[in-house]
């Protein structure tokens, strides 16, 4: 059986852990993952930001690594992919304004393909209008957008994840273990030791 192929949408100032960890973990279990960014080509990089929880009123932000894209956004055909991954950080703030991004996201939702969104990545789902009747979580500041988009907000600790059908969401990177476990389950992946 051919490896499942996943599409990861990223942009400058995507959260460092939220792109690096899932990208590497999904490759580790044998999936093909194409990381793309509007306006950039394979081999180019996006800047990442490290968001941390240090006791302030919101997360802190520090420069992260450069993340190298391994595919080109232009001409991306969503029909060639089995699932979609939407990391958080600052990138979703502007990616959600790109109609080509929204078209891709709508394809995954309309075809009932698995979607994993983390933190602010859910902002892209709200802009695409695909949360009507769905329950999800995200970074708490995204809750009003989820509700306005017709979604049911699920409040949970930052290290937990939520699954509604084939939609897997989590508040932030501390949820990686549970978020990835749930996403892999939705993808039909079983890991045995």
Feature map (PLM): residue ranges:
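Extended, subdomain-level signal for the structured scaffold at the beginning of enzyme domains
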Residues: 1-111, 123-135, 143-193
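Short, thiol/selenol-centered motifs that function as redox-active sites or metal-ligating centers
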Residues: 118-121
């Amino acid at each position: 059986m051919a490896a499942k192929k996943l599409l990861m949408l990223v942009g400058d100032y995507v959260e460092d852990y939220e792109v690096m960890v899932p990208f590497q973990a999904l490759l580790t279990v044998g999936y093909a993952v194409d990381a793309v960014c509007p306006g950039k080509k394979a081999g180019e990089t996006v800047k990442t930001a490290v968001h941390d929880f240090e006791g302030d009123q919101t997360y802190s932000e520090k420069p992260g690594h450069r993340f190298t894209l391994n595919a080109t956004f232009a001409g991306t055909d969503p029909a060639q992919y089995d699932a979609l991954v939407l990391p958080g950080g600052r990138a979703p703030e502007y990616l959600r304004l790109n109609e080509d991004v929204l078209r891709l996201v709508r394809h995954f939702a309309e075809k009932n393909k698995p979607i994993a969104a983390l933190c602010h990545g859910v902002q892209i789902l709200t802009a695409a209008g695909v949360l009507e009747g769905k329950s999800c979580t995200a970074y708490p500041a995204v809750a009003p957008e989820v509700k306005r988009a017709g979604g049911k907000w699920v409040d949970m600790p930052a290290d937990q994840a939520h699954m509604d059908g084939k939609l897997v969401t989590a508040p932030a990177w501390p949820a990686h273990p549970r978020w990835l476990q749930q996403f892999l389950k939705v993808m039909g992946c079983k890991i045995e030791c």
